[in-house]
Amino acid sequence: MKFQRKYWGLLSTLGVSSAVALSACAAQARDVYVTSSASDLLKNNLVPMSMFNVSPTSSFFGSKYAGLTTYIATGSNKDDGVNVTSQTQEKLVLELATSVKGYKKKTSTASNMKTASVSSSSSSTGNNGSTEDEWEVVGSEIKRESGKGDNGKSITEDSNFQTISQQATRYEFTIDTSIKWVDNNGKPVKDEKGQEVKLSSKDFERGFEAYILSSELRFNRNGYFIDLMGLDVEKTVGMTNGKNGTQVKKMTTDSSSTQQSEEKKIEITDDNYDPEDYRSTSDDKFNVYLTSPFPFLLSMMSKEFFFPIPHTHPKVKAIKVGPNSPLVYNEKNSAKILDQTKTNFDGIYGGGGVNAWRDAWSVGPYYVESFNQSQIVFKRNKEYDDHITPNLPKTREGNEQPIPTMINYFQPGATPEVFYSNYIAGGLSSAGVSYSQQEDARSRFASTGDLRWVKVQKTAQSAQITYSSRPYILEGETVKTNSNITETEAKFLYNSESEEALTIRAGINGLINWQNLAIILLPNSGDLNYSIVPFGIFKEKGKDVQVKQKNTGQASQGSDLMNDYYYKI
């Protein structure tokens, strides 16, 4: 198989518009794409391969997972032999879901028109006793098939998107149950009866539960997404109904000599919470309930915190608290906090350090063939390519093919100069060229066609970054900066609640014209409760260009950012 040349520049999330990059080496001839990172793969990452984690799974293992939705970067590359100009656009599409319906609660007037006999015979959704008669469909999205020629569109381009995002408080996803989970050999997993294990709505429910439980135990520091979207946890993954629709437990209270029954809620952190008691009663339907409409729900479902994990896997069933659980907690001020020292991370799905991959299944574009302290080897997942890939939008080049094998090397503390040397030695498929090596790179590669200026001309790509809550860590008696952030970022995070930091954060918010952004995203609403910073928001300008300050008439020299773009999105 012949590969298209890859161009990989060191582009920051604030849109540095050009970089020098090298690509194409002997590794490509073996149908292998090799990259390297300065990260320490397992440092402070006790559960690297599931939603029950400290740092985001996507940092290293995003390729083995897939979500209800995903973003696909589409566009074009123009190569004139000297420069490569990239024009990209992100498209939000359904991935493991074949369709989604948005519902809103019917008004009380409409509900009262239902007679008691009709209400009693209505079908239950299996979620907190609610019935279909209580809900009204506001719109739906269906996965676009490649044969119909319209699978290049984003969900956001559909006429129903605005209505769903602004009104829906229940999202019903239809799951593609034809795709099978595969093991670390790329073979479909079989259960104890010899049946191949297929994707189920219960896999998403367990993924949600693992993330929520981890957050409640103060282990996962990204639990704010639950509050941000306004997830109704009880209706989505709660446990107030038994497997057969029977009530799990009731409390009986005496009030004025009258016996009143009251259903007791069992929290996810309770020892008697049953992880095999599912809200999802059908394998192909998964319902997400919100307390109020959240316009970015479909976008957020592409994040790794909401990916599925195989609910039949023994180590997935072990993600709970209580007797015989590998999770150990301490109680403080009525809150349960995970005891990381006593917890047996080997006993839960995705945990166990370098051994985690051995029994981790995949439903994404790649599976993990091997994994150790220094590298991860990914192999392309045929199941994904058979069922999902054909209906995804084409990326930059219509004839490009997926890479069969990817190898990610980890060299903690390595500098760009080290990666450049590795590329020269034939160990990497691509490398960014730092300023100090540009002259050497020109002399070595200018005539080979491997050296290019990569220019991002226009993008419509969003970037979200979540930082660790531990900017500094203790190694022995030495306090060091956490490996995933810079010293400047660590200082900012360490003092994030100080008066100076709060002033800076307020200033950053002031740079965004929220009213204009709301008009673009929510034309019928004045509210906005989630924001993203587009890739390429700032434009580069020459050192000798003078820019007039907004509303002042003063000039400024030497800045690499056009000041006008501080006020635009």
Swiss-Prot record:
- The question of whether Plastid is a record keyword is answered with no
Q: Which UniProt keywords apply?
A: Cell membrane, Lipoprotein, Membrane, Palmitate, Signal
Record flagged with keyword Cell division: no
Stated membrane topology is: Lipid-anchor
Protein origin, superkingdom: Bacteria
State its location(s): Cell membrane
Where a lipid (S-diacylglycerol cysteine) is covalently attached, the residues are 25
List all Low complexity biased stretches: 119-130, 249-260
Annotated family: To M.pneumoniae MPN_456 and M.genitalium MG321 N-terminal region.
User: What protein name is recorded for this chain?
Assistant: Uncharacterized lipoprotein MPN_459
Q: Which organism is it from?
A: Mycoplasma pneumoniae (strain ATCC 29342 / M129 / Subtype 1)
